[in-house]
Amino acid sequence: MSKKETLKEFFANEVLNSLVDPGEIMSTQNGKDLASKIKTNVQKVLVGKEEVTILLLTALLADGHVLLEDVPGTGKTKLAKALAKSLNAGFSRIQFTPDLLPGDITGINVYDRQKNEFTLRKGPVFTNILLADELNRATPRTQSGLLECMEERQVTIDGVSYTPGEPFFVIATENPIESAGVFPLPEAQLDRFLMKLSMKLPTREEELRILELYMEEDPLHTLTPV
């Protein structure tokens, strides 16, 4: 079996098996057809981002994570939400700020007076697709809260390890032109990302298509899984 065929089989049987109806997978010829369906579905929400969508799916296939670096208004958040909806996957978003704590990401144990015991209050990382919005606005200490779950696919809270989600895919965003109130990503954090992508500003023709697409309502609201 060639590497390409192996990749198709992995896509169909491993990555999407827990997210998409198995009947849908069996009805497609292979994982490539399913990937094409996902890409087409995402294009109902985003205009002119076909290459980025393909690379995002490639990173998901490879069990990696993606850093989207671009100015505001290029569709970074919309892309993450559209992908999650297309896969019928769990989705969480963290808006990173300087006062965010690691426990706000992973979760904490909270004392329950009625039960007289500590119970886990899960953080946003307990999902399938996690959008780490403006990751570089958090301190390196807070950013480190993602290191373990991105690399080892587990979260350790008070000495107990938990599985965040299967699959677990992080899409982080950052604004490259900001200089005030931002922190450079540590090398250990950058090493967790398989790809660093740029969304790029839309062309004039794409702007007109976006205007037509969003004239009545946000198509993301009516987007359905593949």
Regions found by a protein language model. Give the residues of each.
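Conserved ASCE P-loop NTPase core motifs with emphasis on AAA+ ATPases
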Residues: 3-42
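Walker B catalytic acidic pair
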Residues: 70, 133-134, 145
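Canonical AAA+ ATPase core
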Residues: 112-117, 138, 142, 150-226
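Walker A/P-loop
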Residues: 60-97
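Pre-Walker A (pre-P-loop) alpha-helix and adjacent loop at the N terminus of AAA/AAA+ ATPase modules
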Residues: 30-74
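Conserved alpha-helical scaffold flanking the Walker A/P-loop in AAA+ ATPase domains
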Residues: 55-58, 111-131
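AAA+/P-loop NTPase substrate/partner-engagement loops
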Residues: 86-114
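Conserved beta-strand position immediately N-terminal to the Walker
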Residues: 66, 130, 168
